[in-house]
Amino acid sequence: MAAPGARRPLLLLLLAGLAHGASALFEVKNNGTTCIMASFSASFLTTYETANGSQIVNISLPASAEVLKNGSSCGKENVSDPSLTITFGRGYLLTLNFTKNTTRYSVQHMYFTYNLSDTEHFPNAISKEIYTMDSTTDIKADINKAYRCVSDIRVYMKNVTVVLRDATIQAYLSSGNFSKEETHCTQDGPSPTTGPPSPSPPLVPTNPTVSKYNVTGNNGTCLLASMALQLNITYLKKDNKTVTRAFNISPNDTSSGSCGINLVTLKVENKNRALELQFGMNASSSLFFLQGVRLNMTLPDALVPTFSISNHSLKALQATVGNSYKCNTEEHIFVSKMLSLNVFSVQVQAFKVDSDRFGSVEECVQDGNNMLIPIAVGGALAGLVLIVLIAYLIGRKRSHAGYQTI
């Protein structure tokens, strides 16, 4: 990736950390009675495609944002749940859908709609579509208490990271205002004086553990993989020092994916990270390969904690469709100047997988080179033994020639 292209995402990420708007208050009412109140500032980090590759954009919730009345509701008991929809700009929508049980309520789902035809935020975008992304959230509180979170709340969607700041949210209000009692988010945690700070992750962790992945679609399995993954990330810390750290992908992370005619995706995620691997296919040569990597991640000690990178022009882990790619040697896949993906002990097969088993193996060049080393050493030793044997026979013949027969 060219240097200007690498600097632009970093600059946008820095701007994302600085673009903190003031908190705004939003209310949903029914016949003049308030049922939902929410106060927060928000930003939306996403990527989009241009002719020059992926771009990152950070959109702040403007002061002009308002409640969309025909998209918000107090809900009806046993019929529908309350929802808050905020509208701004050219077709942007943020929706919070609430639900409750006997003791707690929560934001069960969050939706964000954005418009790629908006040239102010998406200049030179190839697509002009309107997209809606969604995710579940960890926003929950006790009934008759307000949910309070001073820290950033990050909600990771497929191609969007929503960040809420300085948030107070309450649904199912019993009065027309926030309750004095509050349920605090886990991010705020205890006071820092109650214990020592958490240590930073090690610069170089141990090698990752091999994980098994399986992606199934309507026509059966489209991806079978066994591999250990490690992220090598370079970022700017809060003290303005640049550091490179390695993060292992755990077998305990949640995996999912999708099967398409020309694209197979594998998504591996936990509460702080979403990694997506995209496999493409060259139909003319009947080859599959890793063509794209997308990462959204939280880095707590970074100057800009939200880290988002993608590259869709890769060509790695390549093999014939119907066969599996295998490599025992560690591979380093360059994604950008800020991210590389390290792959260990990989065997992967995409698009065509019969009976949920790997097909014929196509080994990587690196493994072939590694096999040459013991062969060369063995050949050298055999040659040395042969030379010693020849020298011995020549020496023995000469010693016999030195005596005369009586």
Curated annotation (Swiss-Prot):
- What segment(s) does the record annotate as region Hinge? 189-218
Q: What is this protein called?
A: Lysosome-associated membrane glycoprotein 1
Q: For this protein, what post-translational modification is recorded in UniProt?
A: O- and N-glycosylated; some of the N-glycans attached to LAMP-1 are polylactosaminoglycans.
Membrane topology, from the record: Single-pass type I membrane protein
Detail the disulphide connectivity of this chain as listed in its UniProt entry. Answer: 35-74, 149-185, 222-259, 327-364
The positions making up the signal sequence are: 1-24
Originating gene:
Lamp1
Sorted alphabetically, the keyword list is: Cell membrane, Disulfide bond, Endosome, Glycoprotein, Lysosome, Membrane, Signal, Transmembrane, Transmembrane helix
Q: Gene Ontology cellular component?
A: autolysosome; autophagosome membrane; cell surface; cytolytic granule; cytolytic granule membrane; cytoplasm; cytosol; endosome
Give the top-rank taxon of the lineage listed in the UniProt record for this protein: Eukaryota
Which cell locations does it reside in?
A: Lysosome membrane; Endosome membrane; Late endosome membrane; Cell membrane
Q: What does this protein do?
A: Lysosomal membrane glycoprotein which plays an important role in lysosome biogenesis, lysosomal pH regulation, autophagy and cholesterol homeostasis. Acts as an important regulator of lysosomal lumen pH regulation by acting as a direct inhibitor of the proton channel TMEM175, facilitating lysosomal acidification for optimal hydrolase activity. Also plays an important role in NK-cells cytotoxicity. Mechanistically, participates in cytotoxic granule movement to the cell surface and perforin trafficking to the lytic granule.
